[in-house]
A protein has these predicted regions:
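Alpha-helical scaffold segments that mediate packing/assembly in large oligomeric complexes
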Residues: 114-198
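Aromatic-anchored, glycine/proline-accented short structural segments
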Residues: 179-249, 253
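Intrinsically disordered, low-complexity terminal tails
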Residues: 1-35, 342-344
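Residues forming anionic-ligand binding surfaces in small-molecule and nucleic-acid pockets
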Residues: 105-117
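Assembly/oligomerization interface modules of large self-assembling protein complexes
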Residues: 34-108
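Sequence/fold signature of self-assembling virion shell proteins
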Residues: 2-8, 224-345
Length: 345
């Protein structure tokens, strides 16, 4: 096992956080918390599983988190067109009035502490693990809240695409029937069509760019044989890196542990949102996946009223402990539900 060797200056600074002199201890603890401030702020968002879905916007003091909604809604596209003009005549007027969405922000907080002996003995390994647990608590909460917002928007839109049965909008039934829980490339193809047709307008109005799915679905992809894909594509799958992002038809596939039978996001859709799996062609489907249009970052917003603040906790000394606590305030919103849909297989 390799142990990291820390400079004497860092060792002395850590030991000072457990110093018997209250003034020395308070100063050292404050400096320790200040040093953690920026790395923790970065780490909280670098390690989330939202994968750049949300546009993060830090609000100025006193600013409101309000966003204008799109003038054009599905089904209304034909009302917003240009006109062929006669040689003489008045240009038609078009009056629009939009709505605004006010996004509520809320505060989340966390804390962690450790025995003073770890500071006295300069046990960086123990204390850094504790700090990673502190950071992971924020990451876990951000992931959960952000994805519940996406899942709620997808459920509210109500568009569910399957590889079995008739396709949305077109009613096509040419796709062969797949076994329940089996992820197929036909599902991606149908989701692409549904995303574009459901966006309204022409083919540039929306497109499927990313799909978030379970590890078992990716396992199905790795098991595709020559009846599913050609040898060249199979080789690309076999030699892909451990954490490389696979693509099918130009759609990026994101493997997530939270999707799959009995997993967190699956349970949220079924239990909290009361969504049940369909039975298509006498086959009851088993899993959900989520498709997003991230071609334009205009729909998924994360207003941040207060970035993560971390402070030392001087009240723990009587208990022979030291620690930190902190909070941040933010919100989540999906402004345009046309950018999200559910896949089921």
């Amino acid at each position: 096992m390799n142990f990291q060797r820390y400079p004497q200056e860092a060792i002395d600074a850590l030991r000072a956080t457990a110093h018997a002199d209250s003034e020395v201890r308070a100063k050292a603890q404050k400096a320790f918390a200040a040093e953690l401030q920026w790395p923790l702020r970065q780490g909280v968002f670098d390690r989330d599983n939202l994968g750049g879905i949300y546009e993060k916007q830090v609000l100025a003091p006193g600013a409101q988190a309000n966003y204008p909604l799109d003038f054009v809604k599905p089904g209304d596209e034909d009302q917003f067109i240009a006109f062929a003009m006669p040689k003489q005549g008045r240009v038609p007027e078009r009056h629009v009035e939009g709505d605004e969405l006010w996004v509520p922000t809320f505060q989340i907080a966390n804390s962690i502490d450790w025995s003073l002996k770890y500071a006295k003995e300069a046990r960086f390994d123990v204390i850094m693990r504790a700090i990673r647990v502190y950071e992971a608590g924020f990451v876990r909460k951000i992931n959960s809240d952000g994805w519940r917002t996406i899942l709620g928007a997808a459920d509210g839109r109500g568009m569910v695409v399957t590889a079995n049965g008739s396709a949305p909008f077109t009613g096509s039934t040419l796709v062969p029937t797949a076994a329940a829980g089996q992820f197929t490339k036909e599902l991606i193809s149908r989701m692409k069509t549904a995303m574009t047709r459901g966006a309204g307008g022409n083919g540039n109005a929306g497109r499927l760019t990313d799909v978030y799915l379970s590890m078992e679905a990716m396992e199905d992809i790795r098991a595709w044989d020559v009846d599913e894909i050609d040898e060249f594509t199979r080789r690309e799958i076999f030699v892909s890196k451990e954490y490389g992002l696979a693509q099918i038809y130009g759609v990026v596939l994101h493997e997530m542990t939270e999707f799959g039978e009995g997993q967190e996001y699956e349970n949220f859709l079924k239990t909290t949102l009361a969504r049940s799996h369909q039975t298509v062609n006498s086959v009851t489907l088993k899993e959900y996946c989520i498709g997003l249009d991230l071609s334009t970052m205009d729909s998924f917003v994360m207003p941040i009223r207060e970035e993560l603040q971390t402070y030392e906790d001087p009240s723990l000394y009587r208990e022979q402990r030291a620690g930190i606590f902190g909070w941040m305030e933010h919100g989540f919103a999906v402004l345009d539900p046309r950018r999200v849909l559910i896949g089921e297989f």
